[in-house]
Amino acid sequence: MPSTYAHRRFGADVLVQLPRELREKITPYRPLYDMGLHGPDLMFYYRALQSNPVNRLGNAMHEQPGRVFFTRARGVVNTARNKNAALAYALGFVCHFALDSTCHPYVERYTRESGVSHCEIETEFDNQLMREDGLDPMHFFTAGHIRPNREFAKIIASFYENVTADETYGAMRGMVRVHHLLQATSPVKRWVVLTALKAAGTYDVMHGLVANLQPNPRCEASDKELEALYQQALPLAVRLITEYVEGLSNGAPLDKAYDHTFGEF
């Protein structure tokens, strides 16, 4: 998964390229679209420090072809009481899939070649994008667009099997908390966070999510390639979104792009 800022920025870039009528459907439900931009990653944050069925689902979904989720999502949108609200979440999710499926094969290859962790590669790319946008990676709160809300949680939960609205709300709150925790705004806090991760036994998995004080030179090549892949994914997302909306009414088969997982294959 390109990390939080990349998905957030990508979704905003896609939105301005969509047809006006579709933008007008999404805009009143922008918080749901914004949460959809993080796809199944949202579920990672439900009681994130301990393994449980909800956060394991987030991992499992990354290994499934996209069509598994998006086939189910068609039914959810078409039967929703508030169709546009459900649609906004689903279309944000399409953005997540387009960026993940485009970038992840490269990220996994570069991880093997460079020895830099998957998370660190993506966090470094996030930081590079923030610097390009005139933001300070050490102080900009990348999850500021996530707005925990029980009504939103009910809508989002309907897209997942065996996940309740309360669990979804907990995942939303968890996402905000974890991002606050891992935001190392000073060298001292960075040391405290990394020490805490070691004590909790989660250092190997999570340390790459803590921003480096200076760019990692080993990620210069990956930053450049991921920037190119990001641009490549933009027209893919616009096309998949447009076709997905059309398919809600005409039942056309999902694009072959959805044969790819959210991960490497």
Q: What residue ranges belong to the model's regions?
A:
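N-terminal leader/auxiliary helical segments
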Residues: 1-90, 98-265
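Aromatic-lined, polymer-binding surfaces characteristic
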Residues: 95
